Amino acid sequence: MGAFPAGPAHQCTVDDLHGAKFVRDLYDKVGAPVGTRFTVPILWDKKTGRIVSNESAEIIRDLNACFNEFAENPTLDLYPEALRSEIDAVNEWIYHGINNGVYKCGFAVSQSAYDEAVTELFHALDKVEAILSTQRFVAGNVFTEADVRLFPTLVRGGGQ
């Protein structure tokens, strides 16, 4: 995974590992088939020069389970065995109601589709608010991947 420091080329940032200006450049580098969607995040293997994953849920689990030797806090477990069923349940409604919910609103093709999507989104946000009014984190009293998955959408929601 290369960092993308700010670069002058058309207000794009440039990957310092391969000089890629666009995410598409990385997909082209690995010979992605025509019609592939160029999505992020990307977990990149520098040794093999390939995309390991572009699925955020898998990347979170991989980083949690496979990279402890590089972690500042290697004992942090975002998916502890005792909370897995709760985390999975929370992840399910957070994804459908919030993470994907904002896209359902943004890509609605009719007013009724938008109304349905925004209602579902705000029901899920109300649920988060109710949970966080009684406990510190969404899947219990410890920080888990459910919090990691929720955070970016909450942060981005206020800036759009």
Regions found by a protein language model. Name each.
Residues M1-V138, V142:
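GST-like domain detector, emphasizing the conserved glutathione-binding G-site
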Residues V138-Q160:
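GST superfamily/GST-like fold recognition
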